[in-house]
């Protein structure tokens, strides 16, 4: 099956040779081709270039993209799409003055989601989650990481990971699974934190590894949740079972989680709303991708990740949604890109790089996703007719997507 997309007004994120990520000043550079064509063979990008160099092609399908921008589908490297029910009451509680921490301390927050999840059947969780997955695909996401972390019991965590596996089997979107048993301490372990960590290490991880249910291990390293020492213990156990770490750090406090992530060669460190100079310094020259979650900052009215300082320091940065029922009930990467520009003062070029190639890196997919490169997955966004790609963050409330292709097929 050969598909030709022709007369593309502008083809974005064109990389003749594959790159893994972009950092620092390079993030401001977004290679493009104006008046372009793109050829898809089956599920892969086969060729692209300027229309004046279009070779003779016998295409099975032709898409005329006149006036439209084509770019790689978004790569959302941090989500909690699999959950039961919602936490809309907590949304109203916050409006009425309760903080995220206060809600958590009275049984809300993550523990509320855990209660709902453990009371809901695996089939029902799948049915609820697939609706959210289909929504983010329509919004232009072509690769997504999904975490567990609302089970907080052996069976609850396994149930979540089985749902993630079933979604990956039933949908063309690329899905990476992350085990986040260390999301919070269950109520019955509040006075026995070591006991819960032991359960994660001796009961959850062996089952997960044996059944190949996860690619990564995550920990919520934060005051009132998991300490640096506890985080390191769980990361090491995950590594021993073949799971690379990617961890939650610096959402509310800087307690040394970034340094621990780097020490254990974490694929990514995510949130980063609170960053001090030592945290930025610790990330320099490492293989660990910093990931910002601006929709979470928007929804909780907390600080935004200091993108300008980080990019100025030469760091790479990825953007993701943090789609979850409590702090970011949205999987819209278009809004993430716009919010990064508006609130974090990233340029459109930086934000698109962060949401494509750097997002792919943050879930181990940069060899196959995140750029227009021959041999990569044909996961694409075709916009509606727009004046330029600046419209994507500028018209932040508009749906500018005409078509989404995953594995070369319009969804």
Swiss-Prot record:
Keywords: Cytoplasm, Histidine metabolism, Hydrolase, Iron, Metal-binding, Zinc
GO cellular component terms listed in the entry, alphabetical order: cytoplasm
Pfam families named in the record: Amidohydro_1
Binding positions for Fe(3+) per the UniProt entry: 78, 80, 248, 322
EC code: 3.5.2.7
Cellular compartment(s): Cytoplasm
Cofactor(s), by name: Zn(2+); Fe(3+)
Residues bound to Zn(2+): 78, 80, 248, 322
Sequence positions that bind N-formimidoyl-L-glutamate: 150, 324, 326
Pathway of action: Amino-acid degradation; L-histidine degradation into L-glutamate; N-formimidoyl-L-glutamate from L-histidine: step 3/3
Cofactor notes: Binds 1 zinc or iron ion per subunit.
UniProt-annotated binding residues for 4-imidazolone-5-propanoate: 87, 150, 183, 251, 327
Catalytic activity: 4-imidazolone-5-propanoate + H2O = N-formimidoyl-L-glutamate
Cystine pairs: none
Cited HAMAP family: HutI
Annotated function: Catalyzes the hydrolytic cleavage of the carbon-nitrogen bond in imidazolone-5-propanoate to yield N-formimidoyl-L-glutamate. It is the third step in the universal histidine degradation pathway.
Family: Belongs to the metallo-dependent hydrolases superfamily. HutI family.
Protein name from the UniProt record: Imidazolonepropionase
Gene that this polypeptide is encoded by: hutI
